[in-house]
Amino acid sequence: MSNIKITCDSTCDLPQALYAKYDVEVIALSVALGEELHRDGVDISAPELFAYVKESSNLPKTSAVSMGEYLDVFGKYVAEGKTVIHINISSSLSASHQNAVLAAQELENVYVVDSRNLSTGSGHLVIEAGEMVAQGLDAATIVARLNEMKERLDASFVLQTLEYLQKGGRCSSVAALGARALQLRPEIRVADGGMGVGKKYRGSMEKSVLDYIRGRLEGRDDIDTRRIFVTHSPMDSDVVAKAIALVKELQPFEEVIETDAGCTICSHCGPNCLGVLFFKKA
């Protein structure tokens, strides 16, 4: 059994089966619905979150994992003689990374990786870390490789509305107003650890999702086709099925993995959001 323990935060949005496969401990961010504080993925689900928004007209608020919470988790494994590799949502998007770094500085044998990404973009790194642990690589080598790999991540998604990003302080009011007025579905791309607006799509959500996927995958020869995530917030299952079918048609991925966006990600992207997240070739 390896003496390396992988941990990550709840924004990685991987299915429970993958966390179990690689023996990953997930540390939950917090989501506030009014005065009630919930733990992402532990005592609240995305459908429950959007039911609250619909009933109250209030948007959820998210908060980072505290330094103390990280110390508790990291310290538990260090006391067992393990080395911890922790993978975080981008430091540009949450204070979770900085809090994890501060906790790691209080302990020995804890490595904190800033994914410079979000959702299953970070999740890709969790899987790669798990595979390298299984291969018997040492922690320093794994961390160095993860820091190289994260530069090749291609993460983006298409939104029904910019309202959630705007009110969460992740998008300018002007951009939100323009997209709303023109009934555009904006594409958000992860770049340099943050988020920027890419293309804008017109028409129904289904048409926009399929146009977005063509734009990301069609005709490209720089894609690492080992694995792609199709990650989405609650939306029409028929649209998701058509999206997955189109992904398989456009590129010969060995694995196409559908995942549900967790409550932290949903709090900022809203319902009817879908993204494709993959590595580019080395």
Where are these regions (language model features)?
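Short beta->alpha junction loops
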Residues: 64, 115-116
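Mixed-charge interfacial surface used for oligomerization/domain docking
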Residues: 3-5, 11-21, 25, 30, ...
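Class I S-adenosyl-L-methionine
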Residues: 37-106
